[in-house]
């Protein structure tokens, strides 16, 4: 079983990448996607609408069965959303802890699954959001970032969390926002933390068009160049055998790194 965790700053596009990777894998593999973000929107484009979260289900039934928490979407992809508390109430990562405990109790990870993908909020790699790594639910990690300051800042913090948890970083994914020298910036960042750029996803209007219909690009525009990018990324990650324990930059190193590109630009 291939067990992949995708981390990144909130709003960076993790869910889009995860859902399209899952759709790409579904043609040849049995896939489970677990959304570990309080927004609970990872699987919307796979299932066609928002799912009830594990926390929502548990409010109604303390002993749910598998069919209440796992829903089958596009290509047979099995979808789960951990959920989170109402804004301002409780720990945002609590849903991940509760969801993982329930899924394990229900024997989900013993089923006939080839690929598990976790979509994890990574502004802070602590508490519940560290569960996929800390509790050994995921074998490899990928960081999604753009070339923007705050996204890279979060990515560096994620690298710090991965190192602390002794996780295996498989690479950095550039989800492009269209800024100057973006792929070069992210590639250099990946190198600085002892990793590599494993893929770059260009900005495309097809993403928004697909998401307006609650579908992935793979489903809505299967012959598009954008769909090909997602398929290649999925394949490169599936075949990846190069992993490192990252070496995050300290604050001064990070500021110098980012300033270098702004000065050169």
Swiss-Prot record:
Purpose of the protein: The key enzymatic reactions in nitrogen fixation are catalyzed by the nitrogenase complex, which has 2 components: the iron protein and the molybdenum-iron protein.
HAMAP family given in the database record: NifH (MF_00533)
UniProtKB keywords: 4Fe-4S, ADP-ribosylation, ATP-binding, Iron, Iron-sulfur, Metal-binding, Nitrogen fixation, Nucleotide-binding, Oxidoreductase
Cystine crosslinks: none
Keyword DNA-binding listed: no
Alphabetical list of NCBIfam families matching this protein: F430_CfbC, nifH, PRK13231.1
Keyword Nucleotide-binding listed: yes
Residue positions binding [4Fe-4S] cluster: 91, 126
Residues with ADP-ribosylarginine modification: 94
Family of the protein in this entry: Belongs to the NifH/BchL/ChlL family.
Enzyme class, first EC level, given as a word: oxidoreductase
Entry binding sites for ATP: 8-15
Gene: nifH2
Needed co-factor(s): [4Fe-4S] cluster
Pfam families associated with the record: Fer4_NifH
Name of the featured protein: Nitrogenase iron protein 2
UniProt source species: Methanothermobacter thermautotrophicus (strain ATCC 29096 / DSM 1053 / JCM 10044 / NBRC 100330 / Delta H)
